[in-house]
């Protein structure tokens, strides 16, 4: 057992909260202290929401889980929070599959797709670091993707099986080795890596699953621990002496031997019942398949203590009743903790939809004898279960969704940008002669070396408009869903560099399109009600022009819809609040000139910092060249993950898929 140590949260920043940040921080902190369950921070684009969230965490002092809707955003938040809290434990918990194809069965073609997963070692280490941090100290912030609602082992078992070593403790070497094997560490005297230990005489070196380069050297004198030291596993350099060290299990699905025996009996009983059912239905192939697969897994569990796909037996391993709520990361937090949901208008619907998608796929596997029915209990939480497990939540969004609006009595607003930038001016113009009018507006921006985004409703409209603009001599490109990741990033970068002046697209709301050079956003068919022209989508689209001090939006429409009216009124309201603030403090709005980074080194053309060799992708390649490029990108991807630059690693991974698919 380990004791949770208390440390205060300390923010490192050159800035103090300003604008309406202090008020937002105070309101949320008071709400949390008063026991409010739901609060929403309505933060406009560019108002410093992350800084506000950091200050709330510092004031409240509770362990905090921050959920983002994808790995890229989680990676960005992780980097930002790590900068704000260098003295505290900021952890990262996302799905550890670089590439994950879950097992599935397609009955129509009789195709079974094996689980194909390449586990990213760094991310697995970070997951272990996150769970162990929660049992060691209370100043923990975990940034997670929605995968945090997926099943994990029993936290009590995980905590109880910690191997504790202390100087002067009576314990002989073989007892320590036995305990390490019980928590799924393997002995490996040659290839020393995470989750293994090696033995040299009276010295045992352990490489904890939660550490990156640090191993623990335990020295024995007879039946007593004589010395404990932290050592760099590569160089052998002694980093520091320790009086005590807690070694957490190498797997989250760890089970005591006596429990494992009971679990195996339960699995055998379920298998027997299920085989009878299948044979009674004359599903002989399915029965044979299930018997073969399950018996193989059981044999592995008896011999090794685990098997591939052990998570499918989690309901038995944790000795829970069938159909009960699985353990997840949420159970690893104590009684008093906080949840923040970033971009909640996207993240909450994702949390809500996880269970059904997972259930449908697994049901097919169960029906066709690939898995026992209890595999259905290795699942994400249902939304109601998520609600039950969370105590206090803060939703963060520029456009809160219906759930947040319904559950929050008063929105905490953060409208003022410290930079003084205003929300753009909006003009509604009739659709008659709209294209010629649009061309003259673009021309004005081109002369000022500014950029334009044009959003349409259909693919055909986008294509026709792009062709028409090209014929009129405008440097334009079209961004649509079929464009691959690499091309998409190149197009956005080229827009910033001035290779293009205009981008035309249907849904320009995806992350990565916050471009300071854009001074005009044009919305065609603004009066056609629907998902892409809802008040939430319109506000998000308008926000794309809020990073430039000359930002303007033109909506082409023949009537004023409710969504348009709401978006225009809300933007004007925010604009007026910012103007008053600027006047009072003598602030002149100024575009922030963000450096044009290469998200991926493979797209480098003429960046002045590009002095080290990078992977460049030629348009046509021989088989040999393609393989070499794939190898180079693979190296870069692993390095990016090691450097915790998950945004870059994700982009590189997508490039790899594209190259492999083309090959």
UniProtKB/Swiss-Prot annotation:
One of its GO terms (cellular component) is excinuclease repair complex. Residues 627-662 form the UVR domain. Residues 434-600 form the Helicase C-terminal domain. Pfam families: Helicase_C, ResIII, UVR, UvrB, UvrB_inter. ATP binds at residues 43-50. Residues 30-414 form the Helicase ATP-binding domain. It is found in: Cytoplasm. One of its GO terms (biological process) is SOS response. The keyword Cell membrane does not apply. Gene3D superfamilies: P-loop containing nucleotide triphosphate hydrolases (3.40.50.300), UVR domain (4.10.860.10). A motif (Beta-hairpin) lies at residues 96-119. One of its GO terms (molecular function) is DNA binding. Keywords: ATP-binding, Cytoplasm, DNA damage, DNA excision, DNA repair, Excision nuclease, Nucleotide-binding, SOS response. The beta-hairpin motif is involved in DNA binding. Belongs to the UvrB family. Forms a heterotetramer with UvrA during the search for lesions. Interacts with UvrC in an incision complex. The UvrABC repair system catalyzes the recognition and processing of DNA lesions. A damage recognition complex composed of 2 UvrA and 2 UvrB subunits scans DNA for abnormalities. Upon binding of the UvrA(2)B(2) complex to a putative damaged site, the DNA wraps around one UvrB monomer. DNA wrap is dependent on ATP binding by UvrB and probably causes local melting of the DNA helix, facilitating insertion of UvrB beta-hairpin between the DNA strands. Then UvrB probes one DNA strand for the presence of a lesion. HAMAP family: UvrB. NCBIfam families: PRK05298.1, uvrb. This is UvrABC system protein B. It comes from Staphylococcus aureus (strain MSSA476).
């Amino acid at each position: 057992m380990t004791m949770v140590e208390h440390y205060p949260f300390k923010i490192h920043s050159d800035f103090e909260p300003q604008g309406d940040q202090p008020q937002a921080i105070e309101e949320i902190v008071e709400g949390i202290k008063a026991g409010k369950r739901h609060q929403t921070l309505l933060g406009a684009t560019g108002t410093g929401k992350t800084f506000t969230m950091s200050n709330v965490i510092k004031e409240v002092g509770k362990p905090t889980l921050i959920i983002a809707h994808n790995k890229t955003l989680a990676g960005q938040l992780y980097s930002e929070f790590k900068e704000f809290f260098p003295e505290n434990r900021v952890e990262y918990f996302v799905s550890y599959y670089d590439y994950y194809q879950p097992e599935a069965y397609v009955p129509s073609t009789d195709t079974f797709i094996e689980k194909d997963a390449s586990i990213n070692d760094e991310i697995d280490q970070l997951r272990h670091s996150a769970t162990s941090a929660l049992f060691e100290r209370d100043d923990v912030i975990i940034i997670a993707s929605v995968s945090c609602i997926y099943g994990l082992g029993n936290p009590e078992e995980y905590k109880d099986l910690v191997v504790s070593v202390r100087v002067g403790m009576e314990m002989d070497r073989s007892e320590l080795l036995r305990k390490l094997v019980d928590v799924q560490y393997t002995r490996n005297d040659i290839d020393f890596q995470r989750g293994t230990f090696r033995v040299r005489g009276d010295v045992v070196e352990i490489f904890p699953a939660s550490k990156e380069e640090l191993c623990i050297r335990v020295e024995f004198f007879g039946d007593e621990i004589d010395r404990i030291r932290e050592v760099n596993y590569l160089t052998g350099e002694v980093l520091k002496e320790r009086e005590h060290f807690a070694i957490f299990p190498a797997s989250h699905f760890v089970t005591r031997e006596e429990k494992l025996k009971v679990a195996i009996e339960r699995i055998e009983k379920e298998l027997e019942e299920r085989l009878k059912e299948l044979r009674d239905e004359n599903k002989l192939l399915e029965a044979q398949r299930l018997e073969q697969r399950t018996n193989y897994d059981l044999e592995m569990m008896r011999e090794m203590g685990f098997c591939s796909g052990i998570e499918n037996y989690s309901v038995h391993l944790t000795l829970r009743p069938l159909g009960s709520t699985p353990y997840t990361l949420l159970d690893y937090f104590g009684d008093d903790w906080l949840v923040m949901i970033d971009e909640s208008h996207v993240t909450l619907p994702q949390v809500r939809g996880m269970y059904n998608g997972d259930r449908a796929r697994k049901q097919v596997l169960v029906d066709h004898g690939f898995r026992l029915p209890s595999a259905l209990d290795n699942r994400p939480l249902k939304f109601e279960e998520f609600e039950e497990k969370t105590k206090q939540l803060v939703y963060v969004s520029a456009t809160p969704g219906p759930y947040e609006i319904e559950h929050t009595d008063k929105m905490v607003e953060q409208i003022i940008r410290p930079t003084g930038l205003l929300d753009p001016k909006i003009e509604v113009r009739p659709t008659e002669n709209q294209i010629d009018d649009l061309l003259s507006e673009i021309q004005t921006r081109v002369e000022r070396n500014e950029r334009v985004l044009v959003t349409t409703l259909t693919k055909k409209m986008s294509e026709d408009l792009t062709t028409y603009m090209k014929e009129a001599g405008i440097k334009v490109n079209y961004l649509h869903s079929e464009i691959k990741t690499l091309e998409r990033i190149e197009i956005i970068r080229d827009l910033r560099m001035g290779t293009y002046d205009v981008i035309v697209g249907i849904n320009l709301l995806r992350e990565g399109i916050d471009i300071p050079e854009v001074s005009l956003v044009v919305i065609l068919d603004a009066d056609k009600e629907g998902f892409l022209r809802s008040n939430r989508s319109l506000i998000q689209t308008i926000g794309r022009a809020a990073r430039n001090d000359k930002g303007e939006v033109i909506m082409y429409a023949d009537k004023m819809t409710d969504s348009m009216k709401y978006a225009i009124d809300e933007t004007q309201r925010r604009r007026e609040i910012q103007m008053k603030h600027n006047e009072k403090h003598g602030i002149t709005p100024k575009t922030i000139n963000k450096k044009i980074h290469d998200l991926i080194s493979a797209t480098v053309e003429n960046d002045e910092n590009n002095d080290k060799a990078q992977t460049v992708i030629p348009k046509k390649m021989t088989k040999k060249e393609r393989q070499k490029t794939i190898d180079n990108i693979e190296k870069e991807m692993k390095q990016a993950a090691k450097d915790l630059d998950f945004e870059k690693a994700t982009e590189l991974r997508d490039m790899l898929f594209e190259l492999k698919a083309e090959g």
